[in-house]
Amino acid sequence: MSGGLDILSLKEDDITKMLVATTHLGSENVNFQMEQYVYKRRADGVNILNLGKTWEKLQLAARAIVAIDNPSDIFVISSRPIGQRAVLKFAKYTDTTPIAGRFTPGAFTNQIQPAFREPRLLVVTDPNTDHQPIMEASYVNIPVIAFTNTDSPLRYIDIAIPCNNKSAHSIGLMWWLLAREVLRLRGTISRSVEWPVVVDLFFYRDPEEAEKEEAAAKELLPPPKIEEAVDHPVEETTNWADEVAAETVGGVEDWNEDTVKTSWGSDGQF
C-alpha cells in the first residue's frame, strides 16, 4: 500500500508502540474473512495479527477519510467505554462528528425523528458492539470503516483495520495513528515533524482510578504553612472619654428652670 515509498512505510517507533499496546494480539477465535490478516497462532491459542497489513489498511482508511470534502459528514462511533475518549479526541483534531455512547436506533433511517443524520462515512470501533449503526448504514449505502479483531464479522464493512479492539491501550493507539495519518494527508502536519499530541490523551481512563490518583496526589502535597502570630507593641493612648464627659457635665444648662416671662403689653400686664 505504501507503493515502495520509505516515507509511507511503517516506522520502528510505530511498531514499538503497537507491540507495547498489544495491538498485534487477536482473540482465540478467527472469522474466516479475517484469516488473511492473521500472521500465525501461538501455542496458547491466541492469534497474532500481521502489523504490516494493519498499517496498509490504516493508510487506506485515512485516504478514504481525506476524500470527504466536509469532515463533519464523517461520523466516528464507539459504544464501548474504552473507545469513547479516543473517539472524542479524534473528532476534536479532525473536525469529524463523534457519537460516544449509545447509538439512537433510526438515526440514519428514520427521517421523522430529531436525531436523524445523513453521514457520508462511518468509522466504528467494534463491529460487534456497533452493529446497529453498521446495519443502518447498509440500508442507505453509507461506507463503513471498522477496527476489527480476528473474531469480528466483516459483513457490511468496506474497510477493515485489523487490530486488537478489546484493549483500551490498543484501540486508543489505533485512533491516534489514524488521526495523525489523516492530518498528514491533509497537510496539517508534516511527516518530518513529530506530532505534539501524545497518545496518552486517547487512552481510556476509569473514573474511579482517576479519583484515586487525584486523592493520592493531594496526599503527596506538602501541608500548607501556617504563619505564627506576631505580637505588635501597643502604644499607650489617653482616655479622651473622661475629659469629654467632664466638660459635658459642667456645661449643660438646666432646662427645667422657669423662664422669665416677658410682657409684650405697655402696662406690664399679660
From Swiss-Prot:
Compartments it resides in: Cytoplasm; Nucleus
Domain of life of the native organism: Eukaryota
Q: Which GO terms describe its cellular component?
A: cytosolic ribosome; cytosolic small ribosomal subunit; nucleus; ribosome
- For this UniProt entry, which residues form the secretion signal? none
* NCBIfam families named in the record: uS2_euk_arch
What does the function comment of this entry state?
Answer: Required for the assembly and/or stability of the 40S ribosomal subunit. Required for the processing of the 20S rRNA-precursor to mature 18S rRNA in a late step of the maturation of 40S ribosomal subunits. Required during oogenesis and imaginal development.
What the record says about family reads: Belongs to the universal ribosomal protein uS2 family.
Protein name, UniProt field: Small ribosomal subunit protein uS2
Originating organism = Drosophila melanogaster (Fruit fly)
Gene responsible for this protein: sta
